[in-house]
């Protein structure tokens, strides 16, 4: 049988999602848990697939992975979570066809970037985002990673103000390495008035215009959702969701305390 999982993770606690030697990664921790439980022997023998790689510091709410196993009774969120570090949690599972590939079968991916909104003109960001919709060559918005083509399609970009923050949602069929974070950088520059839409149009024509721009910080980016055409009967584990929520409330409290401490360090009072 083949099982798919939805997992979430705090990206700042890992050196990316893809397994690497000598550093802690999301896949490294997941594979260790699955092996310890006897769910798989190895990723290769289980035909493991993942919806997409996230870089160090990037978070996920709904990363999707799939693998073959004959231990369906163990391949469920609360059992797997018992072997996972608190920075990762599985919260839904489903039986899927043996042919299901979490990456190739995905039709779109939804990312959200959160940043401070005090310095930006949201109307300029929204206007500029319209030029990015559709199919373009995003070579100027990526780090070279051996991709055969840098042409990608963006289906939707939404920018909105939420209190003192700006949230930018980007939905597309697939993304190049660092593409979303570089798009955020470009929109931020336009929102600050440092660049304009004429420059953005030039950036979308890499055959005649080349410019490297920095990626926005990884900690603001989350993979929110991966979409598939085929209907998958996901079973959510409310206990695992509730437990993760409790742990994240503790993280929120810690960050609030740290924010106050930093304010005191600035004020010298």
From Swiss-Prot:
Q: For this chain's UniProt record, which GO biological process terms are given?
A: tRNA pseudouridine synthesis
InterPro entries xref list: PsdUridine_synth_cat_dom_sf (IPR020103), PsdUridine_synth_TruA (IPR001406), PsdUridine_synth_TruA_a/b_dom (IPR020097), PsdUridine_synth_TruA_C (IPR020095), TruA/RsuA/RluB/E/F_N (IPR020094)
Query: What keywords is this UniProt entry annotated with?
Result: Isomerase, tRNA processing
Binding of substrate occurs at 111
Taxonomically, the superkingdom here is Archaea
CDD domains listed in its UniProt record? PseudoU_synth_TruA_Archea
- What EC number(s) are associated with this protein in UniProt? 5.4.99.12
Which reaction(s) does the protein catalyse, per the Swiss-Prot or TrEMBL entry?
Answer: uridine(38/39/40) in tRNA = pseudouridine(38/39/40) in tRNA
Q: Does the keyword Chaperone apply?
A: no
Active-site positions on this chain: 55
What family is reported? Belongs to the tRNA pseudouridine synthase TruA family.
This protein is called tRNA pseudouridine synthase A
